[in-house]
């Protein structure tokens, strides 16, 4: 590893590409990487629609391999005016995230460093362990981009942190993201499509909450096989 080039932005870009290819291949082989990898064309399409701007804070509460934050960095860097102030804002006060799992946390931080984010603002913590009623204005973000885990089953003590109690991990994350979004902010979130059809009380309540609390722009139903792993 000591012999690898790591000086120029081109070197870092090549290394980051190799790193993400390795994560993707892990997912294709059915190993751990598939839990943390969202297809990059999908991420880029979501970011194009959201159009994050310099000065806005971008958040992912289920960071995984940090694909959303890395792609948002690339998007904003290419489009912003290159000056000292903007570069400082982009590096230090733009990208934020949380990740519970040890491997995912390490993978995400490393991916951000390889993309050029020198000191990632990623917390190693359980996002769902934080009561949403404690989220204040200072804790909110202009942009949220995420693909929270599907199919998890959360314990009752975790469910108590949310207004709508459900064991479905992704549905708790959705509540967290809504609460964490600034007024007038934008979010693009990948979530299982059963949120549209489940007839249990929690799913009905969550759909009602989304329609009443958010300005819902688009629902895009992806075909089978979109995700690896």
Regions found by a protein language model. Give the residues of each.
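Non-catalytic, mostly N-terminal accessory regions of nucleic-acid modification and defense proteins
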Residues: 1-54, 123-130, 221-225
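Acceptor-substrate binding/catalytic loop of class I
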Residues: 195-199, 228
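Class I S-adenosyl-L-methionine
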Residues: 215-229
